[in-house]
Amino acid sequence: LKLRDMTREELLDAIDKKYKAMGQDPDVHLSGLLYAEPMKYWDFIQVDALLGLQTQRTQLPDEMVFIMYHQINELIFKMILWEIEQVSKADPISTQKFAMHLGRISRYFDLLSNSFDIMGEGMEPEQYMKFRDTLTPASGFQSAQYRKIEFASTELINLIDNRFRATIDRNTPFEHAYDHLYWQAAGKDYETGAKSKLLLNFEDKYFEEFITFMKDYNTLNLWTKFKSLPK
């Protein structure tokens, strides 16, 4: 029965049962409604907090575009991870539900792909080259959510540098596999083991979180869930 189809009595009865099941007094919650302020859009979306997150390091106008664009990307990454989580938690999962969430993920990636012109056409190259130097050694490479999307989308072996895949299997410790991920090559000298400041900062912040995430999605990633779908 949908909430909008309930009579007033049925709705009150449902509320009564809900709070009693939680060991709480339904009347206390109902009386609280007498004093609660109606929800407002700007409070629900937390607009003031959201619009206060853009802090420039220079006075160059296009730096603001750069900051907002990447913050929007991170929000979309969060939407993608949210959909992947719904798939991974569903046990079992139907083909219909899998396809629904995958369709949402695909649309989010379409949104990202279609936004590249904001970077290419929406900023003056001269301004970008100036404020970019103030961000060193920070890089979009350090987007933890992007890396998590990779971990949650496929089996770990598919993210290993091709040069080392033959040495990695299901019994390989996650820490060892992590050190041989394809993107490690962007900041690591495999002959000396030396890592760039960019990679060291990234790992100082997220290494433990990444290892936990890799373990969590080892058998719950999108590819593994897809293979478990009914034939």
Task: Label the model's feature ranges.
Residues K2-K231:
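Surface-exposed peri-terminal alpha-helical interaction modules
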